[in-house]
Amino acid sequence: MTADNAIFIPPYKADDQDVVVELNNRFGADAFVAQETRTGMPVLWVKRAQLKEVLSFLRGVAKPYSMLYDLHGVDERLRTQRRGLPAADFSVFYHLLSIERNSDVMIKVSLSEGDLNLPTVTGIWPNANWYEREVWDMFGIDFAGHPHLSRIMMPPTWEGHPLRKDYPARATEFDPYSLTLAKQQLEEESARFNPEAWGMKRQGANEDYMFLNLGPNHPSAHGAFRIVLQLDGEEIVDCVPDIGYHHRGAEKMAERQSWHSFIPYTDRIDYLGGVMNNLPYVLAVEKLAGIKVPQKVDVIRIMLAEFFRITSHLLFLGTYIQDVGAMTPVFFTFTDRQRAYTVIEAITGFRLHPAWYRIGGVAHDLPRGWDKLVKDFVEWLPKRLDEYTKAALQNSILKGRTIGVAAYNTKEALEWGTTGAGLRATGCNFDLRKARPYSGYENFEFEVPLAHNGDAYDRCMVRVEEMRQSIRIIDQCLRNMPEGPYKADHPLTTPPPKERTLQHIETLITHFLQVSWGPVMPANESFQMIEATKGINSYYLTSDGGTMSYRTRIRTPSYPHLQQIPSVIKGSMVADLIAYLGSIDFVMADVDR
């Protein structure tokens, strides 16, 4: 599928300084403090008094920064390596993305502990709503003018702000937990939905509205996810998504794990993405360390990542068709996923959560016979996809339930931070593997599937076509696998290559320290985004020169995708909501982290 794209996307330009010149011309060079990082984008500190004006300028400039890609905070109080930066107890960063420039810029603002407040930017980017709520939830930073500043990850009754450095990171640091009857009643009452708190009316002109909880254990919610629906009959007047039931504190865990030992935790973010979760993390760490991996490592990583793109999309396809009424295909897609997992397990030793990528390489070399397994799979799957297209995707029931349902355009997608198939289904040709190649994707031939209606059916079809392109990429990996090592020869490669430990005592000591304590990364900041199974996934890492991350920010695609739901589904039927939820393709671990 192809579509005419109204937005021309130029070649990627890392550290694009054009926007810095524009900002200096508009506000003066004295308005900003530039920070040198390894993020691949300009990072500028601005005074709080000018923050909103600067952000509004970037939103309205020629070739605008239409997407607020991310917004979060950092507790700076224990950070020791801050030379040249404005004094700050806390900081908040705004990561902006321009499709038309194909470049990013990060704006930071410093805050003192006794004055933790900022103006809301929900009037500039609507998706700032959830991000500002999360910053308040995690750090206690207030956003003046926010329409509903409340807990989003933690329960309403929670005390404290978990991502502060003085907040305990382990259960053993808390008092023993007990649930009294009074506390149980308090928790139950706090979960009761109050329409007035969200600006909703209980009655219309001639009718009473019904409020319905869809979830948090509804099968069509695809996880612990609750949506409170305001209904007039079966028509959705309004709705409020409620997340956080699956929150496990992944970003807090990263502060207590070594750079190496956090890798298995990345697998559990999008738990259907496998090594796709490892990739942005290890790439970001390798930027910090200055590691350039061998070409063979790049090709192996791409091959395994595309295998997991296929397994994730197969699960989406089967469960989505089941959501709209066809029960049989899900059994076939699960069987077909098993064939892919057979290959994955033979190469990595694990199925869903291999935790197989390493800082500087992969866990081990490809096993004997891997090529035959991969060859058999790439020859078999295209015919299988043809069968799915004919038997399921051309089915009149699926088309009737999804064509024209939950449609949105490119402008709306960018305003809400939508990426991946949900963005490309609107006709926007933005795939990081093409627009900003990483790990050697520029060496592969493949197409970016597009659609143009932006509805539930198009989102489904884009993912099916993506599986065909993944097969093309895997086939090229098979035919062009380089010779060479599976780890970089670098002091911070972890675990280090073991051969030298058998010859030199110094390398044996280094090996022991890096495996037991973890590598010491240079003090700096790095960032890496990738085209994951559900959209753009990224890691923003802050190192203070130690064996653990000072701050790890995990930006996932499913989080903004769920925030977009009310703007898309108002005025539709409840049955259309089910079709819409399935077409998003999300898992709650990817939302809640």
UniProtKB/Swiss-Prot annotation:
HAMAP family: NDH1_NuoC, NDH1_NuoCD_1, NDH1_NuoD
Membrane topology: Peripheral membrane protein
Name by which UniProt lists this protein: NADH-quinone oxidoreductase subunit C/D
E.C. numbers: 7.1.1.-
Subcellular location: Cell inner membrane
Xref: Gene3D superfamilies: Cytochrome-c3 Hydrogenase, chain B, NADH:ubiquinone oxidoreductase, 30kDa subunit
Species this chain originates from: Pseudomonas putida (strain ATCC 47054 / DSM 6125 / CFBP 8728 / NCIMB 11950 / KT2440)
Keyword Cell inner membrane: yes
